[in-house]
Amino acid sequence: MSESISHQLQLIRRGCQELLIEEEFAQKLAQGRPLRVKAGFDPTAPDLHLGHTVLLNKLRQLQDLGHHILFLIGDFTGMIGDPSGKSATRPPLTREQITQNADTYASQVFKILKPEQTEVVFNSSWMDKFSAADVIRLAATYTVARMLERDDFSKRYHENRPIAIHEFLYPLVQGYDSVALKADLELGGTDQKFNLLVGRELQKHYGQPPQCILTMPLLEGLDGIQKMSKSLNNYVGINESPAEIFGKLMSVSDTLMWRYIELLSFESLETVRQWQNEVESGCNPREIKMRFAREIVARFHSQTDAVRAAEEFEARFSKGVIPDDIPEKKLYIQDAGLALPQLLKLAGLTASTSEALRMIEQGGVKLNGDKVSDKTRIIPSNVTVIAQIGKRKFAKVTLVTEQSGKQAN
Protein backbone atom coordinates (compact mmCIF):
# COMPACT_ATOMS: atom_id res chain seq x y z
CA MET A 1 0.00 0.00 0.00
CA SER A 2 1.42 3.38 -0.99
CA GLU A 3 2.17 6.08 1.54
CA SER A 4 -0.48 8.33 -0.06
CA ILE A 5 -3.22 5.74 0.37
CA SER A 6 -2.12 4.98 3.94
CA HIS A 7 -2.32 8.70 4.72
CA GLN A 8 -5.82 8.94 3.25
CA LEU A 9 -7.00 5.92 5.23
CA GLN A 10 -5.60 7.36 8.45
CA LEU A 11 -7.49 10.61 7.95
CA ILE A 12 -10.70 8.90 6.88
CA ARG A 13 -10.67 6.53 9.87
CA ARG A 14 -10.52 9.44 12.33
CA GLY A 15 -13.70 9.51 14.37
CA CYS A 16 -15.43 6.83 12.30
CA GLN A 17 -17.13 3.81 13.82
CA GLU A 18 -16.53 1.29 11.06
CA LEU A 19 -15.06 1.12 7.55
CA LEU A 20 -16.30 -1.80 5.44
CA ILE A 21 -14.53 -3.33 3.59
CA GLU A 22 -11.20 -1.55 4.20
CA GLU A 23 -9.22 -3.69 1.73
CA GLU A 24 -11.75 -2.97 -1.01
CA PHE A 25 -11.71 0.71 -0.16
CA ALA A 26 -7.92 0.83 -0.41
CA GLN A 27 -8.23 -0.72 -3.87
CA LYS A 28 -10.70 1.97 -4.90
CA LEU A 29 -8.32 4.66 -3.65
CA ALA A 30 -5.51 3.04 -5.64
CA GLN A 31 -7.44 3.71 -8.85
CA GLY A 32 -6.38 7.33 -8.52
CA ARG A 33 -9.75 8.85 -9.47
CA PRO A 34 -12.20 10.94 -7.45
CA LEU A 35 -14.50 8.49 -5.69
CA ARG A 36 -18.27 8.95 -5.80
CA VAL A 37 -19.19 9.39 -2.14
CA LYS A 38 -22.87 9.22 -1.25
CA ALA A 39 -24.65 10.46 1.85
CA GLY A 40 -28.41 10.61 2.11
CA PHE A 41 -30.52 13.04 4.11
CA ASP A 42 -34.26 12.76 4.52
CA PRO A 43 -35.59 16.30 4.86
CA THR A 44 -37.68 15.60 7.94
CA ALA A 45 -36.33 18.62 9.84
CA PRO A 46 -35.26 21.81 8.09
CA ASP A 47 -32.61 22.97 10.57
CA LEU A 48 -29.28 21.23 11.02
CA HIS A 49 -27.51 20.85 14.35
CA LEU A 50 -23.98 19.78 15.25
CA GLY A 51 -25.04 16.14 15.36
CA HIS A 52 -25.74 16.30 11.62
CA THR A 53 -22.35 17.89 10.98
CA VAL A 54 -20.43 14.82 12.17
CA LEU A 55 -21.27 13.28 8.81
CA LEU A 56 -20.86 16.55 6.92
CA ASN A 57 -17.40 17.08 8.40
CA LYS A 58 -16.31 13.67 7.14
CA LEU A 59 -17.69 14.50 3.69
CA ARG A 60 -15.69 17.74 3.69
CA GLN A 61 -12.59 15.79 4.67
CA LEU A 62 -13.16 13.47 1.70
CA GLN A 63 -13.55 16.52 -0.53
CA ASP A 64 -10.21 17.84 0.72
CA LEU A 65 -8.75 14.51 -0.40
CA GLY A 66 -10.14 15.12 -3.89
CA HIS A 67 -13.34 13.07 -3.86
CA HIS A 68 -16.79 13.93 -5.23
CA ILE A 69 -19.77 14.18 -2.88
CA LEU A 70 -23.24 13.01 -3.86
CA PHE A 71 -25.47 14.88 -1.40
CA LEU A 72 -28.73 12.97 -1.69
CA ILE A 73 -31.89 14.61 -0.43
CA GLY A 74 -34.36 11.80 0.03
CA ASP A 75 -37.49 13.60 -1.02
CA PHE A 76 -39.03 10.29 -2.14
CA THR A 77 -37.95 8.26 0.90
CA GLY A 78 -39.02 11.11 3.16
CA MET A 79 -42.58 10.32 2.20
CA ILE A 80 -42.05 6.78 3.54
CA GLY A 81 -40.39 7.74 6.81
CA ASP A 82 -37.16 6.05 7.93
CA PRO A 83 -37.99 3.37 10.54
CA SER A 84 -34.34 3.00 11.65
CA GLY A 85 -34.19 2.79 15.42
CA LYS A 86 -37.87 3.56 15.78
CA SER A 87 -40.18 1.58 18.04
CA ALA A 88 -43.30 2.53 16.10
CA THR A 89 -44.35 3.36 12.57
CA ARG A 90 -43.20 6.85 11.64
CA PRO A 91 -45.77 9.13 9.95
CA PRO A 92 -44.77 10.11 6.40
CA LEU A 93 -44.38 13.70 5.27
CA THR A 94 -46.30 15.29 2.43
CA ARG A 95 -44.58 16.35 -0.80
CA GLU A 96 -45.13 20.00 0.17
CA GLN A 97 -43.51 19.53 3.59
CA ILE A 98 -40.55 17.75 2.06
CA THR A 99 -40.03 20.39 -0.63
CA GLN A 100 -40.16 23.16 1.95
CA ASN A 101 -37.67 21.41 4.23
CA ALA A 102 -35.32 20.45 1.39
CA ASP A 103 -35.09 24.07 0.26
CA THR A 104 -33.37 24.97 3.53
CA TYR A 105 -30.53 22.48 3.12
CA ALA A 106 -28.22 24.18 0.62
CA SER A 107 -27.60 27.38 2.60
CA GLN A 108 -26.67 25.28 5.63
CA VAL A 109 -24.60 22.43 4.18
CA PHE A 110 -22.43 24.75 2.10
CA LYS A 111 -21.15 26.26 5.30
CA ILE A 112 -19.18 23.01 5.44
CA LEU A 113 -19.08 21.41 1.98
CA LYS A 114 -17.41 22.82 -1.13
CA PRO A 115 -20.14 23.58 -3.71
CA GLU A 116 -17.83 22.82 -6.64
CA GLN A 117 -17.25 19.26 -5.37
CA THR A 118 -20.84 18.62 -4.30
CA GLU A 119 -23.63 17.27 -6.48
CA VAL A 120 -27.05 17.71 -4.88
CA VAL A 121 -29.45 15.01 -6.07
CA PHE A 122 -33.03 14.03 -5.25
CA ASN A 123 -34.05 10.39 -5.27
CA SER A 124 -37.45 11.28 -6.69
CA SER A 125 -35.53 11.83 -9.95
CA TRP A 126 -35.42 8.07 -10.50
CA MET A 127 -37.98 6.71 -8.03
CA ASP A 128 -40.86 8.74 -9.50
CA LYS A 129 -40.29 6.81 -12.73
CA PHE A 130 -40.71 3.45 -11.01
CA SER A 131 -43.81 1.51 -12.00
CA ALA A 132 -45.65 -0.87 -9.69
CA ALA A 133 -43.89 -3.72 -11.49
CA ASP A 134 -40.50 -2.07 -10.82
CA VAL A 135 -41.29 -1.80 -7.12
CA ILE A 136 -42.32 -5.47 -6.96
CA ARG A 137 -39.12 -6.51 -8.74
CA LEU A 138 -37.10 -4.44 -6.27
CA ALA A 139 -38.98 -5.98 -3.33
CA ALA A 140 -38.21 -9.45 -4.70
CA THR A 141 -34.47 -8.92 -4.11
CA TYR A 142 -34.86 -9.24 -0.32
CA THR A 143 -36.73 -11.64 1.96
CA VAL A 144 -38.80 -10.86 5.03
CA ALA A 145 -36.37 -12.99 7.05
CA ARG A 146 -33.48 -10.74 5.98
CA MET A 147 -35.48 -7.63 6.89
CA LEU A 148 -36.19 -9.06 10.34
CA GLU A 149 -32.44 -9.23 10.97
CA ARG A 150 -32.66 -5.51 11.67
CA ASP A 151 -32.76 -4.93 15.41
CA ASP A 152 -35.67 -2.49 15.36
CA PHE A 153 -37.82 -4.68 13.11
CA SER A 154 -36.93 -7.81 15.08
CA LYS A 155 -37.79 -6.17 18.39
CA ARG A 156 -41.15 -4.93 17.17
CA TYR A 157 -41.94 -8.32 15.62
CA HIS A 158 -41.21 -10.24 18.83
CA GLU A 159 -43.17 -7.73 20.89
CA ASN A 160 -46.16 -8.14 18.57
CA ARG A 161 -46.07 -4.50 17.55
CA PRO A 162 -47.07 -3.64 13.98
CA ILE A 163 -44.60 -3.30 11.12
CA ALA A 164 -46.14 -1.82 7.99
CA ILE A 165 -45.16 -3.31 4.62
CA HIS A 166 -44.05 0.09 3.35
CA GLU A 167 -41.37 0.22 6.08
CA PHE A 168 -39.61 -2.73 4.43
CA LEU A 169 -39.40 -0.63 1.28
CA TYR A 170 -37.34 2.11 2.93
CA PRO A 171 -33.99 0.24 3.07
CA LEU A 172 -34.62 -1.11 -0.43
CA VAL A 173 -35.20 2.34 -1.88
CA GLN A 174 -32.20 3.74 -0.01
CA GLY A 175 -30.15 0.84 -1.31
CA TYR A 176 -31.35 1.39 -4.87
CA ASP A 177 -30.19 5.01 -4.60
CA SER A 178 -26.64 3.63 -4.52
CA VAL A 179 -27.36 1.74 -7.73
CA ALA A 180 -28.75 4.85 -9.44
CA LEU A 181 -25.75 6.94 -8.34
CA LYS A 182 -23.06 4.26 -8.89
CA ALA A 183 -21.69 5.07 -5.44
CA ASP A 184 -18.18 3.96 -4.46
CA LEU A 185 -18.64 4.78 -0.78
CA GLU A 186 -21.68 5.55 1.35
CA LEU A 187 -21.62 7.31 4.70
CA GLY A 188 -24.23 7.03 7.43
CA GLY A 189 -24.79 6.91 11.15
CA THR A 190 -24.31 3.69 13.07
CA ASP A 191 -28.09 3.25 13.08
CA GLN A 192 -28.01 3.14 9.27
CA LYS A 193 -25.64 0.19 8.89
CA PHE A 194 -28.32 -2.27 7.76
CA ASN A 195 -29.58 0.13 5.08
CA LEU A 196 -26.05 0.78 3.84
CA LEU A 197 -25.41 -2.94 3.53
CA VAL A 198 -28.62 -3.32 1.51
CA GLY A 199 -27.19 -0.80 -0.95
CA ARG A 200 -24.04 -2.87 -1.26
CA GLU A 201 -26.06 -6.05 -1.95
CA LEU A 202 -28.30 -4.35 -4.50
CA GLN A 203 -25.30 -3.03 -6.41
CA LYS A 204 -24.03 -6.61 -6.68
CA HIS A 205 -27.50 -7.70 -7.86
CA TYR A 206 -27.48 -5.06 -10.59
CA GLY A 207 -23.96 -5.94 -11.71
CA GLN A 208 -22.12 -2.99 -10.17
CA PRO A 209 -18.98 -2.99 -8.00
CA PRO A 210 -20.30 -2.89 -4.41
CA GLN A 211 -19.89 0.31 -2.46
CA CYS A 212 -17.80 0.45 0.68
CA ILE A 213 -19.41 1.68 3.88
CA LEU A 214 -18.27 4.24 6.43
CA THR A 215 -20.37 4.58 9.57
CA MET A 216 -20.07 7.57 11.87
CA PRO A 217 -21.03 7.56 15.55
CA LEU A 218 -24.08 9.43 16.77
CA LEU A 219 -23.11 12.59 18.64
CA GLU A 220 -24.33 12.84 22.21
CA GLY A 221 -26.35 15.91 23.09
CA LEU A 222 -25.42 18.55 25.65
CA ASP A 223 -26.65 16.22 28.40
CA GLY A 224 -23.96 13.70 27.43
CA ILE A 225 -26.46 10.84 27.55
CA GLN A 226 -28.89 10.76 24.65
CA LYS A 227 -28.05 11.53 21.03
CA MET A 228 -28.29 15.16 19.99
CA SER A 229 -31.85 15.94 18.99
CA LYS A 230 -34.05 19.00 18.67
CA SER A 231 -36.93 17.07 20.22
CA LEU A 232 -34.81 16.44 23.34
CA ASN A 233 -33.68 20.08 23.45
CA ASN A 234 -30.05 18.99 23.91
CA TYR A 235 -28.80 20.33 20.59
CA VAL A 236 -26.62 23.11 19.17
CA GLY A 237 -28.12 24.45 15.95
CA ILE A 238 -25.69 25.65 13.29
CA ASN A 239 -27.94 28.65 12.57
CA GLU A 240 -28.10 29.74 16.19
CA SER A 241 -26.47 33.00 17.23
CA PRO A 242 -22.72 33.07 17.94
CA ALA A 243 -23.38 33.73 21.62
CA GLU A 244 -25.82 30.83 21.89
CA ILE A 245 -23.48 28.36 20.15
CA PHE A 246 -20.54 29.49 22.27
CA GLY A 247 -22.48 29.34 25.53
CA LYS A 248 -23.91 25.90 24.84
CA LEU A 249 -20.50 24.44 23.97
CA MET A 250 -18.98 25.92 27.12
CA SER A 251 -21.70 24.16 29.14
CA VAL A 252 -20.66 20.61 28.18
CA SER A 253 -18.75 18.49 30.67
CA ASP A 254 -14.96 18.24 30.46
CA THR A 255 -15.28 14.58 29.47
CA LEU A 256 -17.82 15.26 26.72
CA MET A 257 -15.61 18.08 25.45
CA TRP A 258 -13.06 15.59 24.12
CA ARG A 259 -15.78 13.62 22.37
CA TYR A 260 -16.99 16.80 20.66
CA ILE A 261 -13.46 17.76 19.68
CA GLU A 262 -12.85 14.31 18.17
CA LEU A 263 -16.00 14.40 16.05
CA LEU A 264 -16.40 18.11 15.30
CA SER A 265 -13.01 19.84 15.33
CA PHE A 266 -10.93 20.31 12.18
CA GLU A 267 -7.75 20.61 14.24
CA SER A 268 -5.11 18.00 13.47
CA LEU A 269 -4.67 14.90 15.61
CA GLU A 270 -1.29 16.30 16.65
CA THR A 271 -2.92 19.51 17.91
CA VAL A 272 -5.57 17.59 19.85
CA ARG A 273 -2.88 15.43 21.46
CA GLN A 274 -1.05 18.62 22.42
CA TRP A 275 -4.23 19.94 24.06
CA GLN A 276 -4.61 16.70 26.00
CA ASN A 277 -1.01 16.97 27.18
CA GLU A 278 -1.65 20.55 28.32
CA VAL A 279 -4.61 19.43 30.45
CA GLU A 280 -2.59 16.55 31.91
CA SER A 281 0.08 19.11 32.81
CA GLY A 282 -2.39 21.24 34.74
CA CYS A 283 -4.08 23.45 32.14
CA ASN A 284 -7.73 24.17 32.97
CA PRO A 285 -9.96 22.22 30.51
CA ARG A 286 -12.01 25.41 30.23
CA GLU A 287 -9.22 26.94 28.15
CA ILE A 288 -9.39 24.07 25.65
CA LYS A 289 -13.17 24.37 25.59
CA MET A 290 -12.82 28.08 24.75
CA ARG A 291 -10.55 27.28 21.78
CA PHE A 292 -12.97 24.66 20.51
CA ALA A 293 -16.03 26.91 20.94
CA ARG A 294 -14.28 29.70 19.02
CA GLU A 295 -13.51 27.28 16.18
CA ILE A 296 -17.13 26.16 15.85
CA VAL A 297 -18.55 29.70 16.00
CA ALA A 298 -16.04 30.88 13.38
CA ARG A 299 -17.02 27.98 11.10
CA PHE A 300 -20.70 28.85 11.04
CA HIS A 301 -20.41 32.62 11.45
CA SER A 302 -17.04 34.40 11.30
CA GLN A 303 -13.79 34.81 13.18
CA THR A 304 -14.95 38.24 14.34
CA ASP A 305 -18.15 36.72 15.70
CA ALA A 306 -16.13 34.04 17.48
CA VAL A 307 -13.92 36.60 19.22
CA ARG A 308 -16.93 38.70 20.21
CA ALA A 309 -18.80 35.64 21.53
CA ALA A 310 -15.80 34.69 23.66
CA GLU A 311 -15.53 38.22 25.06
CA GLU A 312 -19.26 38.34 25.81
CA PHE A 313 -19.05 34.95 27.49
CA GLU A 314 -16.21 36.12 29.71
CA ALA A 315 -18.09 39.29 30.58
CA ARG A 316 -21.37 37.51 31.22
CA PHE A 317 -20.15 34.62 33.32
CA SER A 318 -16.88 35.80 34.82
CA LYS A 319 -17.89 39.39 35.55
CA GLY A 320 -21.65 39.03 35.89
CA VAL A 321 -22.44 41.50 33.10
CA ILE A 322 -25.83 41.23 31.40
CA PRO A 323 -25.42 40.95 27.59
CA ASP A 324 -26.68 43.61 25.19
CA ASP A 325 -28.38 41.31 22.66
CA ILE A 326 -31.20 40.08 24.89
CA PRO A 327 -34.34 38.91 23.09
CA GLU A 328 -37.30 41.18 23.82
CA LYS A 329 -40.80 39.94 24.59
CA LYS A 330 -44.00 41.94 25.06
CA LEU A 331 -46.70 40.19 27.09
CA TYR A 332 -50.28 41.42 27.09
CA ILE A 333 -52.15 40.76 30.33
CA GLN A 334 -55.67 41.46 31.57
CA ASP A 335 -54.81 41.96 35.22
CA ALA A 336 -52.66 44.48 37.03
CA GLY A 337 -49.76 42.06 37.17
CA LEU A 338 -48.43 38.62 36.28
CA ALA A 339 -47.07 35.89 38.55
CA LEU A 340 -43.34 35.36 38.09
CA PRO A 341 -43.57 31.63 37.20
CA GLN A 342 -46.09 32.42 34.46
CA LEU A 343 -43.93 35.27 33.17
CA LEU A 344 -40.94 32.94 32.87
CA LYS A 345 -43.01 30.41 30.93
CA LEU A 346 -44.62 32.94 28.58
CA ALA A 347 -41.24 34.58 27.95
CA GLY A 348 -39.94 31.22 26.74
CA LEU A 349 -37.36 30.86 29.50
CA THR A 350 -38.96 27.70 30.91
CA ALA A 351 -41.11 25.02 29.34
CA SER A 352 -43.72 25.15 32.11
CA THR A 353 -44.69 26.98 35.27
CA SER A 354 -43.65 23.94 37.30
CA GLU A 355 -40.15 24.20 35.83
CA ALA A 356 -40.16 27.92 36.65
CA LEU A 357 -41.13 27.18 40.26
CA ARG A 358 -38.36 24.61 40.50
CA MET A 359 -35.78 27.07 39.13
CA ILE A 360 -36.89 29.70 41.67
CA GLU A 361 -36.55 27.16 44.49
CA GLN A 362 -33.04 26.29 43.28
CA GLY A 363 -32.00 29.94 43.21
CA GLY A 364 -31.59 30.00 39.45
CA VAL A 365 -33.85 32.99 38.69
CA LYS A 366 -32.88 36.67 38.60
CA LEU A 367 -34.81 39.83 37.81
CA ASN A 368 -32.72 42.81 36.73
CA GLY A 369 -29.64 41.02 38.03
CA ASP A 370 -31.02 40.27 41.50
CA LYS A 371 -31.79 36.72 42.65
CA VAL A 372 -35.47 36.03 43.33
CA SER A 373 -36.62 33.49 45.93
CA ASP A 374 -40.29 34.48 46.28
CA LYS A 375 -42.35 32.05 44.18
CA THR A 376 -45.49 34.17 44.63
CA ARG A 377 -43.97 37.41 43.38
CA ILE A 378 -46.21 39.41 41.06
CA ILE A 379 -44.66 41.56 38.34
CA PRO A 380 -46.81 44.69 37.83
CA SER A 381 -48.09 45.69 34.42
CA ASN A 382 -46.57 48.46 32.29
CA VAL A 383 -43.03 47.70 33.45
CA THR A 384 -40.02 46.14 31.75
CA VAL A 385 -37.80 43.62 33.52
CA ILE A 386 -34.76 41.58 32.51
CA ALA A 387 -35.48 38.00 33.49
CA GLN A 388 -32.67 35.47 33.73
CA ILE A 389 -32.63 31.69 34.14
CA GLY A 390 -29.29 30.15 35.03
CA LYS A 391 -26.26 31.59 33.29
CA ARG A 392 -27.34 31.62 29.66
CA LYS A 393 -31.04 32.40 29.34
CA PHE A 394 -32.15 36.03 29.28
CA ALA A 395 -35.26 37.87 28.16
CA LYS A 396 -36.26 41.53 28.29
CA VAL A 397 -39.96 41.34 29.15
CA THR A 398 -42.48 44.18 29.01
CA LEU A 399 -45.91 43.66 30.57
CA VAL A 400 -48.76 45.59 28.96
CA THR A 401 -52.35 45.72 30.21
CA GLU A 402 -54.59 44.59 27.36
CA GLN A 403 -57.81 46.60 27.43
CA SER A 404 -59.47 44.47 24.77
CA GLY A 405 -59.30 41.40 26.96
CA LYS A 406 -56.57 39.59 24.99
CA GLN A 407 -54.76 36.95 27.06
CA ALA A 408 -51.02 36.96 27.65
CA ASN A 409 -49.16 35.46 24.72
UniProtKB/Swiss-Prot annotation:
Domain S4 RNA-binding: residue ranges: 338-399
Enzyme Commission (EC) number: 6.1.1.1
Main location: cytoplasm
Short motif ('KMSKS' region): ranges: 227-231
InterPro entries xrefs: aa-tRNA-synth_I_CS, aa-tRNA-synth_Ic, Rossmann-like_a/b/a_fold, S4_RNA-bd, S4_RNA-bd_sf, Tyr-tRNA-ligase, Tyr-tRNA-ligase_bac-type, Tyr-tRNA-ligase_bac_2
Family annotation (PROSITE patterns): AA_TRNA_LIGASE_I (PS00178), S4 (PS50889)
Domain of life (superkingdom): Bacteria
Entry coiled-coil feature ranges: none
GO annotation, biological process: tyrosyl-tRNA aminoacylation
Any one GO cellular component localisation term in the record: cytosol
Catalytic reaction annotation: tRNA(Tyr) + L-tyrosine + ATP = L-tyrosyl-tRNA(Tyr) + AMP + diphosphate + H(+)
Protein location: Cytoplasm
Molecular-function GO term, any one: RNA binding
Binding site for ATP: K230
Keywords: Aminoacyl-tRNA synthetase, ATP-binding, Cytoplasm, Ligase, Nucleotide-binding, Protein biosynthesis, RNA-binding
Short sequence motif named 'HIGH' region, residue ranges: 43-52
Record-stated family: Belongs to the class-I aminoacyl-tRNA synthetase family. TyrS type 2 subfamily.
HAMAP family: Tyr_tRNA_synth_type2
SUBUNIT field: Homodimer.
Functional description taken from the UniProt entry: Catalyzes the attachment of tyrosine to tRNA(Tyr) in a two-step reaction: tyrosine is first activated by ATP to form Tyr-AMP and then transferred to the acceptor end of tRNA(Tyr).
Stated name of the protein: Tyrosine--tRNA ligase
Annotated organism of origin: Nitrosomonas europaea (strain ATCC 19718 / CIP 103999 / KCTC 2705 / NBRC 14298)
Gene (name only): tyrS
